Amino acid sequence: MAIRVRRSTGNVFRDLGFGPEAAEHLRVRSELMIQLCKLLQKRGLTQAKGARLLGVTQPRISDLTRGKIDRFSIDTLVEMLGRAGVRVSFVMTRRRRVA
């Protein structure tokens, strides 16, 4: 049985079959979620203390740490990072191909 290898697009969500816009939206949300989780871990915060810092409930922190990406908007994640004292900035680049 031959194994087929496909070159990645650089976006795991695109590779999984999501459209370009949806894949990019998911990529941004996942990166923001990862950064929030790293911040909580680096500061050694429990879910309850993290919730107080970020202005959300403990179950929301549980959703965050469990990767429930569908439960968070980019706006919400940016607000949470802001409450933790993190300034979010984006670098925008042009895609190589536009369909």
Model-based region annotation:
Residues 44-62:
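Short alpha-helical DNA-recognition segment
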Residues 74-91:
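DNA major-groove recognition helix of helix-turn-helix/homeodomain DNA-binding modules
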Residues 89-99:
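Short, charged recognition helix plus adjacent turn
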Residues 28, 32, 57-60, 73-77:
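Amphipathic alpha-helical interface surfaces
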Residues 29-45:
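Short, amphipathic alpha-helical "recognition" segments used to contact nucleic acids or chromatin
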Residues 65:
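DNA major-groove recognition helix of helix-turn-helix
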Residues 1-34, 99:
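N-terminal flexible/basic segments that precede or flank functional cores
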